[in-house]
Amino acid sequence: VPDPEKSHDLDILFYNSAAGTADSGESVLHQVEQYFQMVWSDSHSKTWLESAPFFYRKSVLLETEALHMRHSTWREAHPELLSKQNTDYIEATVPLKAVTFIHNPINILAKEPLVWWQLQQLMEGAEERVYLQTPYAVCDQSMYDGLSRVAGRGVPFSVQINSMGVGDNFMASSDYYRNKARVLDTGAQVWEWYGDYSSHGKSLLIDQDLAA
């Protein structure tokens, strides 16, 4: 059972099946690495803290010890996952026809919402179903309008978010409390997660062959 005191994300492993060959450079993973380096080396990226503040130091040390213990336990339980010789990633993963990496601009201040625009175009092109998972529904008017257009196409459209009882982001949960009627007015079928922990996964399923 997940720790109820922590948020739980959705992580996906991508494996470059062409690694070590002449086609390795075509993998989308290189684009992800380039994006990371672009953000890391940007002139506006600065070190925030060299060490934990005094009033956080004890909790940071306790969490560090817990992570080390969890890692040691995991290594003992699954040694095969750390062995390059015995790990068959092709067997452990599912082949994909194509993978596209999209991201917003990294400039400071206001940014063009490129990621949302592209996701919205994909949703509006759905023919069978759209399932959107997000921790919180904090929208501006253009996003409300976009969700309404998706729902208005008549394709089953579901949105899964944290209920206000399990959401661990006070500001985001407060926004949903204030604007819940606006979210429902988009026409999407809204599912509120009432689990024992806060879900922080972000995913999008379109028809039977596209995920984001």
Residue map of PLM features:
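Charged, low-complexity intrinsically disordered terminal segments
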Residues: 1-212
